[in-house]
């Protein structure tokens, strides 16, 4: 019985500490995530299509991974 009560109290404490992420904030995508390029590693975003931010073409390495050609 004590174990059940302790478990319930711990669960309540954990859920009260964790704040839910607002839906609007969680669904917002940055410009890069919507279809831009990932310039820090010269990899194209999967949604960017056959281009990079700098105008270079993307080479498809896998379905989700493409690399900018210089």
Curated annotation (Swiss-Prot):
An example Gene Ontology molecular-function term: toxin activity
Cell compartments where the protein resides: Secreted
Record's keyword terms, sorted: Disulfide bond, Knottin, Neurotoxin, Secreted, Signal, Toxin
Tissues showing expression: Expressed by the venom gland.
Disulfide-bond pairs as recorded: 37-53, 44-58, 52-68
Highest rank taxon of the organism: Eukaryota
Any one GO cellular component localisation term in the record: extracellular region
Propeptide: 21-34
Signal peptide: 1-20
Record function comment: Insect active toxin causing rapid but reversible paralysis in crickets. No activity shown in mammals. Does not show effect on mammalian voltage-gated calcium channels.
Family: Belongs to the neurotoxin 01 (U2-agtx) family.
Comment on protein domains: The presence of a 'disulfide through disulfide knot' structurally defines this protein as a knottin.
Protein name: U2-agatoxin-Ao1t
């Amino acid at each position: 019985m004590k174990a059940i009560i302790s478990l319930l109290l711990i669960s309540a404490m954990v859920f009260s500490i964790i704040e839910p992420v607002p839906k609007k904030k969680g669904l917002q995508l940055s410009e890069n995530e919507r279809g831009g390029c990932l310039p820090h590693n010269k990899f194209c975003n999967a949604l960017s299509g056959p281009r990079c931010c700098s105008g270079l073409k993307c080479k498809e390495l896998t379905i989700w991974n493409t690399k900018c050609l210089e």
